[in-house]
């Protein structure tokens, strides 16, 4: 099986729901990394006054590696369970991974 990297960028207000969903499915997700991010650009809606002043919206980025089939199942699960979560995602092949 080919491993892929699934990256999710999402509004902070849904991050806990996404993390809880991922943690509930250890059969699909071995683990993940969540970090603070900032959304920039014309596709990012700035709503709060602080966002308008700063010019970016606070986001959370979650990354996980696993078999492509599992990562696609994660996307389907997110779409079914959190249809309005406003998630941006991408999948890329993993050439190599390991622990040093």
Spans of model-derived segments:
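Positively charged, small/polar-rich N-terminal and surface patches that mediate targeting and assembly
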Residues: 1-100
């Amino acid at each position: 099986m080919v491993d892929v990297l699934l990256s999710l960028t999402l509004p902070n207000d849904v991050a806990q729901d996404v993390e809880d969903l991922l943690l509930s499915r250890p059969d699909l997700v071995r683990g993940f990394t969540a970090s603070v991010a900032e959304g920039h650009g014309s596709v990012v809606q700035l709503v709060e006054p602080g966002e308008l002043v700063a010019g970016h919206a606070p986001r959370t980025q979650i990354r996980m590696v696993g078999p492509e089939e599992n990562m696609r199942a994660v996307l389907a699960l997110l779409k079914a369970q959190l249809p309005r979560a406003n998630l941006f995602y991408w999948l890329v092949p993993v050439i190599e991974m390991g622990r040093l």
